[in-house]
Amino acid sequence: MNVVFHRRFEKMAGKLPAMTKKKMVERIALFSKDPLNSVLRNHALHTPYKSSYSIDITGEYRAVYELIDDQTALFTHIGTHSHLYK
């Protein structure tokens, strides 16, 4: 799976704690090799992220993405569960 990042995602990722950034890199690398790996807990979202999906970065942090086509995912948001889904 090809991965691209929205500018907003890059800005949000830049504000993450160092250990979370490291975990993010690991999880997105895993996602690019195996998007349905059970560790990622990949799942579809509802309002306000209709037609988007989420993967777990840590127990607290999630990354939200949209599928552009069969082989490309656009990551749009990253943050804590409570911040993203309030």
What annotation goes with each model-predicted range?
Residues 22-24, 28, 42, 63:
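Hydrophobic alpha-helical segments, especially transmembrane helices
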Residues 2-7, 11, 15, 22, ...:
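Enriched for short, Lys/Arg-rich terminal
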